């Protein structure tokens, strides 16, 4: 989960998600931070940085945070996992609509997302609504560079359509990439992401490509400091954030809780 320093408050910061009871977040060292779950939960999100910059920690934090505060009735996921490493553990969640880890299944999963988006637009048209009022669907992709290098012809048109139209239908892309190159994160694709989390990059040029300014190249190596740091670009604003790493035991506990539920809340 992402946190921003809240220096003017002596109380834990809270965030209301999906109109539910506010959730209080306190870091292990007792400092108070303002959570970014509300912002992340309602936008496309791009997470990118060099290898070892904390991308997997951030993605796991986002998924775990969303699952901790909402039921499968309100939040669903399509997991696109060409790396076959980080997202596999979430396949058994009742929130998981589809899990894909090979070319055929990845194309099928993205096609499913587009079909669901179109279905929601049909409902919105029939009800004369500008935004979808039902559940949120997150299409989590780890690793974007694998798709853009191996399956671009089949997958990029689907990704671009979701990026351009998905937000109104509550179909949100969460894309992670450890390759910060223009041929992977194209300007046509990136401009549809109002929220970008820039992690440590190799060069200032890569930082500018991600968040439109320098800074990511100066972030410390999380392996050396023991904690993840990043820079979030939210529209025209940028700010530094610390990234809390959920222990593997906590992620497992959350997954086991939901898989043990006899019925969906």
Short names for language-model regions:
Residues 2-125, 135-205, 211-227, 231-232, ...:
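P-loop NTPase catalytic phosphate-binding loop
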Residues 130, 134:
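Conserved phosphate/pyrophosphate-binding and hydrolysis machinery centered on Walker-type P-loop NTPases
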